[in-house]
Amino acid sequence: MNVIKFPAREDWAKIVERPHLDVSELNQTVSAVLNVVRQRGDEAVKGYELKFDHVDLNDLSVTQKEMDEAEQQVSNELKEAIRLAHHNIKVFHESQRFTGKKVETQPGVTCWQKAVAIEKVGLYIPGGTAPLFSTVLMLATPARIAGCREIVLCTPPGRDGKVNPAILMAARIAGVSQIFKIGGVQAIGAMAYGTESVPKVYKIFGPGNQYVMAAKQQVSLHEVAIDMPAGPSEVCVVADDSCNAEFVAADLLSQAEHGIDSQVFLITTSNKVIDDVQEAVSRQLNLLPRKEIAQKTLENSTLVLVNDLNEAIDLSNAYAPEHLILQTENYMELAEQVVNAGSVFLGQYACESAGDYASGTNHTLPTHGYATTYSGVNLDSYQRKVTFQHLTAEGVSNIGRAVELMAEAEQLDAHKNAMTVRLNSLK
């Protein structure tokens, strides 16, 4: 773990910089796969499933029988955990329902908005070393609340042609419409373009590796919307002497086990915290089954010693982390200063894992510094706002001349005339 003490502000940009990868070759590969999927549909998807996921599929769809079998394979204890998480996610996202009100901007001029669901959405759920069934809940639950008519899910099958049963169980609980055994770039292409089996969707959500992220970016240029650009997962912990070093170490490791490209960042006002956390990390690391992955992540992690907590928050805002944990004595006060973060965890008991699974907030969050401009997934992600305006004769009288003058100044005579004929009708 790299320790930096009292860095000058002019050096912060270098400290918070994410690694940049040359993706030119990767983008060419992704583009080629997408083009074949666009042209050949199911045939191409099945071919890529055989090539990349090593499974020969006759049917891309998950059947009702497979759903029922999966439910039997998931323990009752895990089912209850999934239901609890789903309940909390549902409660939190239902609280985000839009309640538009009519506003009279001038007498006779009334404006308002209406929230309208995106009709068809696609969810990508990674498989691999950690099948993320929790992400099914995070993406499908708000889609269902928003009123999306069709919720399509793609996830890679195992070599036996089966989808992880917990993913299917979560999909059933959250109300997914259709599930397909497709992974990687071919899944993104199938949802973006549509195939004989997979319906074309209007917006694609979900995490994935560099190939999946590149595919989402490419299809978003022409075909569909996406939730957000994304990079490797990351956490920043701000801690002072009041923190529990064991808790901080556990939080850093929970992020480090995601993958070797994950980012781990600790900002503290105490030398002792740095020493205690490093010792606790070393001890806890040896207990992890994914020790090797976490170890490689930690080699690129950063521990920063700063002068005070105000400086710590300034540095965190410059970093704009996906996850921000405040383990300080005055965490509520500090929270008011946070402006750039995907999701914030307050106090020693609010571990990142709580938000990852069951507190109710969404864990699909902006990474790679995008928290400066993007929100995490929320109910608005699945809706559009349609604006309405109604003018009476009085309204035309009140704003008509202003419209004429502005249209004339922009040299848009037809725009001016559309109002002029109405004004003349009132004379």
Name what the model sees in each region.
Residues 1-119:
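N-terminal Rossmann-like NAD(P)+-binding subdomain of aldehyde/semialdehyde dehydrogenases
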Residues 98-103, 225, 262-267, 287-297, ...:
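Flexible, glycine/charged-enriched surface loops at secondary-structure junctions
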Residues 103-169:
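Conserved small-residue-rich beta-alpha loop and adjacent elements
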